[in-house]
């Protein structure tokens, strides 16, 4: 009987792990934020007045993905697939942008959405 208990315990443990794994795989993965729908509205509210058609602070235009990838005086604003190494995220994270006198900071939720958007662009140059 004692030899049977470890076997029974192992079987129960394996079946529990299999169920947890199956549930995790069934969970829908959050979709990557969309530039037009999710990202651009934030930029329009908080960035484009200084980085758009009329003004291009640092020679950076934030109205299109292509312009962000091209960047401005300091190089590309984004490193696709790596938000942590993207200048845009660094400047927002340390609250260097937007400037205090120019308007509201990007919220923590917006910053996280921007990180997810950049990280989802892996493989894009």
Language-model segments: residues:
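Bacterial N-terminal signal peptides
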Residues: 6-16
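Aromatic- and Gly/Pro-enriched helix-to-coil junctions and flexible linker segments
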Residues: 19-125
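Positively charged n-region of N-terminal signal peptides that target proteins for export
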Residues: 1-4
């Amino acid at each position: 009987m004692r030899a049977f208990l470890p076997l029974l315990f192992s079987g129960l443990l394996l079946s529990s792990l299999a169920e947890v794994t199956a549930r995790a795989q069934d969970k829908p993965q959050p979709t990557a934020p969309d530039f037009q729908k999710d990202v651009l509205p934030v930029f329009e509210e908080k960035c484009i007045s200084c980085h758009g058609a009329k003004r291009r602070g640092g020679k950076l235009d934030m109205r299109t993905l292509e312009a962000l990838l091209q960047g401005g005086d300091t190089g590309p604003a984004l490193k696709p697939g790596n938000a942590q190494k993207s200048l845009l995220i660094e400047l927002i994270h340390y609250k260097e942008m937007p400037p205090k006198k120019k308007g509201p900071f990007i919220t923590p939720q917006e910053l996280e959405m921007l990180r997810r958007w950049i990280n989802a662009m892996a493989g894009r140059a």
